[in-house]
Structure formats: C-alpha cells, structure tokens
Amino acid sequence: MSKVWVGGFLCVYGEEPSEECLALPRDTVQKELGSGNIPLPLNINHNEKATIGMVRGLFDLEHGLFCVAQIQSQTFMDIIRNIAGKSKLITAGSVIEPLPPDPEIECLSSSFPGLSLSSKVLQDENLDGKPFFHHVSVCGVGRRPGTIAIFGREISWILDRFSCISESEKRQVLEGVNVYSQGFDENLFSADLYDLLADSLDTSYIRKRFPKLQLDKQLCGLSKCTYIKASEPPVEIIVAATKVAGDQVQLTTEPGSELAVETCDVPVVHGNYDAVESATATTAMSNQNLPNTTPLLSSPPFSDCVFLPKDAFFSLLNVTTGQQPKIVPPVSVHPPVTEQYQMLPYSESAAKIAEHESNRYHSPCQAMYPYWQYSPVPQYPAALHGYRQSKTLKKRHFQSDSEDELSFPGDPEYTKKRRRHRVDNDDDKEMAREKNDLRELVDMIGMLRQEISALKHVRAQSPQRHIVPMETLPTIEEKGAASPKPSILNASLAPETVNRSLAGQNESTDLLKLNKKLFVDALNKMDS
C-alpha cells in the first residue's frame, strides 16, 4: 500500500490572526527551526492518544511556515478505509475530472481539512528550557488564516496544488523532506470510533466553518483540483426547459463568484389557446440544434405538467387574454329597478301615489314608464337623531373605583361608590387611566411605608442592630489571576464548551445575592 502524505501552511506571514496570541512572527520561526526541533508527532485535533504519524519537515517559505507529514498508523487507515466504503458522498466520486479516484484521500480531505500547530506561548517566560513546537494536528478547521491540509500519495502532487509556492521553493521542500519512513508504534493510536465520532460532532458545531475554509483556500492559492469538499459545497442546479425560452445556470462556480445567468427574448406567439402547444414544440425543436447545452430536466412520468419559463408564460398569457372578445352587456331600454322596493301593478301604485303626492309630482307618463314603484323612504331626521344622542350623553352611570373588587349592600364601600360621567373622548379616557395609575401608585407607596415601619419596629426589638452583608463574588480580574493560564497554545477551532444551564444558575444566584445586599444597605441607611 502506498504512503499517505499531508502538507499545508501552519501560518501565513502576511495575514494577522483573529487573536493576538496566535501571531507567529517570522523571526521566531527562523530561530526555532534552527534549533532542530524536528520531528514532531502528528495527531488528530490535539489528542495525544490519537497520534497517527510524524512530521517529516518544517520549511520557512516566503508565504509562510510549510509542513510536510506522513500518516503511518495502519489502525487509523483501516478505520478511514471502512468509512470511505460506506460513505455515499465518497462513493459517488469526485466531480472534477483531473482528480484520480481515491476514496481514502477523499475521506481524509473531507474529515480533516485543517492544520493546527501546537506551540509554546510567546509571553510565557517559565518555559525557556522546553521546545517551542509541541506537535501538529489535523482538524476540522484551523484558527490561524490559511491553514489548509492537502492529502495525497506524492509530495510533488501536494506541492503542485499551491500556486503561492515557487519552483525553487518546491525543490527546496522535496530535497529537505525526510522520505525514509521510520518505525511507528501502533500503541500511540489508542483512540476508537467513539473518539472520532465525538470529534466530528464537535467539528459540525463550529460556527462559520465553511466560510473560513473557503477563505483559507483562497489565501493559499489552492487550485480547483483538490479533494476538499468541505470548502466547495455542491450547488443545486436548476435548469429551465430550454435555453431559448428561459434561464440557464452554470454547473460549477468559483468561491465568491456570482452565478452566471444567460437570458434571451421570447418571441411573441399569435394564436388563442393553441399558443402553448406551438411554443412548446418550437422550443423543443430549437434545443436539438443548439450545441453545448445542458441536458434538459425531464418531467416526472406521473405528472402532466409542462416546464415553461416565466417570460414565455406571461407572454402567452398576455396574447391569450388580449385576443379574447370582450363581452359588453346590452343596454336596457327601461330604467334600473331598485330591488329593495316591491313592484306593484299600475292600478294599485297609481292610486297610492295619487293619494300622497299627486299635487306635488303630478301623474307619471304611462308611455315612458310602463310600471310603477314606491318612492324611496325619506331618511331619518338628523335633528331628531342629534336630540336623542345628546339626551343619551346626559345620563350618568354608576361605576365603582375597582372592577375586580365586589361590594354588597351593608358594606361601607357600597354607599361610597362614586358617580362619573361617561367618557367618550380619547383624551378623557387617557386622563382617567393616568389618574387610576397614579392612585394605584400612591396606594403601593403607602403599603411599602407601612411594611418598612413594621420592619423597623421588629429590628428595634431584636438584639442585633445591624445585619452583616454576605460576601461578594470575585470579579473577572480576580478569577483570571486565580486560574492559571495554559502554557501550550493549540491553534484549532473548537465549539463553545460553556454549560448554559450552570451559567444560568450562577446568574440567578448572583442576582439574588445582589438584591439581598441592596436591601440590607437600604435598611441600615434608614436606621442611621
């Protein structure tokens, strides 16, 4: 079985990390590389029980600190081989044609696309005698910019993926790598499937993982021909029925680029309801003559629908609605009939109209209007309506001060009910509401005064005069000074490990203690 190599940058000199402690100056790297602190162990996500190989070389290149390592654990490779055989994503193969099919390399690239360097903290002066570089890890995503791991069978193939590495630097790396594999102790890899599953679960909850991998890939100048599927999520392709009548989306896009859309005009189709069938037949025949087009998406066999672009649909709809004849209702010779009044024969209606309105309106013309109807009922007199409304406003209604409290005959509150005018204006309602709120506030203040006076009386009878407040919790600075800082810095991202339930309990406990302290201070001030 051929060897498995991994290469990538552990830091990029031209990019500043998000945290100041992750900064790794170039002079420090050159100084530590001269000390000969190589080889280093290669593990998974800084887990010393999951050591899978050794680092074969660290190189100070113009772009950054480059690392070449070899995976030597056969136990770990057996696990990767079994996972790759059951993964549907890896079984489907690579979308990019130049890449040779290699399930093991694809599984490693998808699971551990990041590199992380564990080094000594620069500000720590107590670790002068210990080596600066501790180990290198493959992880889900690195904390430093540009830390992408490229897996492959040959070192030269890995170096060709990086466009930021010059030809002279590639020769330098190939000459400096220790290709002679030494013996590897399989006992160094004591992790099991549960450890790998827990690691993948933690990696899936890292925020902004995919954007970080895409940015790292751009910083390293990686070519498109890589096995890293985490940084290139598949794009859902939605292709229209035809290229002439719709939109077409490109199959693949570069990271950060916009989807290219090609549109064209839709010819106007003349006809009535047969226009849909003719347009569909025309576009289907035109697709056969178009070269280099994306194959059409066939409609499901159980569906009778036809895929039609939006522009073609609206154009056909406009043509169809424009050619339909407009139906104009015929003009009636007779005047409109009011449905709310009953039509009567000529003899009855003429007699009633003549009885009430013959002197004012005279008799109607029988030749023009062959039927008769009642005249409309006169409207309700506005003056009478205004009089009744003003009379209603003068009424007074009994209303208690509180709707929640009930009173019965014989109670003292029953005879003290106030009479208030009925309020119809919004401003008056708002003023009444504010008065009620103010009255409730005054009552609450009076109750608080009574309780405070009762507490004073109780405390005056007790032998202890003052209450000793509880001890306050330590501040953030005191906690930082009490807890020791780690001496080894691991540059791999991990999800937040704060227990939210415990944090909520601590916050509620702190708030309760703070309220007790404020209440005790207020009582002491009132006594003094």
Curated annotation (Swiss-Prot):
Q: Which organism is it from?
A: Human herpesvirus 6A (strain Uganda-1102) (HHV-6 variant A)
Q: What class of enzyme is it?
A: hydrolase
**Which Enzyme Commission number(s) are listed?**
3.4.21.97
Q: Where is the active site?
A: H46 (charge relay system), S116 (charge relay system), H135 (charge relay system)
* Region annotation (Disordered) ranges: 394-431
Stretch list, region Interaction with pAP:
270-288
Species lineage, top-down? Answer: Viruses, Duplodnaviria, Heunggongvirae, Peploviricota, Herviviricetes
Q: Which Pfam families match?
A: Peptidase_S21
One GO cellular component this record assigns the protein to is: host cell nucleus
> What molecular function terms (GO) are annotated for this protein?
identical protein binding; serine-type endopeptidase activity
Q: Which InterPro entries match?
A: Herpes_virus_sf, Peptidase_S21
What's in the keyword line of the UniProt record?
Answer: Host cytoplasm, Host nucleus, Hydrolase, Phosphoprotein, Protease, Serine protease, Viral capsid assembly, Viral release from host cell
At what residues does the UniProt record annotate the site feature described as Cleavage? A230, S231, A491, S492
Q: Which domain of life is it from?
A: Viruses
Identify the stretch(es) annotated as Interaction with major capsid protein: 508-528
Concerning its family, UniProt says:
Belongs to the herpesviridae capsid scaffolding protein family.
Q: Name one GO biological process term.
A: viral release from host cell
Q: What is this protein called?
A: Capsid scaffolding protein
Q: What is known of its domains?
A: Region of interaction between pPR and pAP is called Amino conserved domain (ACD). The region of interaction with major capsid protein is called carboxyl conserved domain (CCD).
- Transmembrane ranges? none
Q: Where is this motif: Nuclear localization signal?
A: 416-422
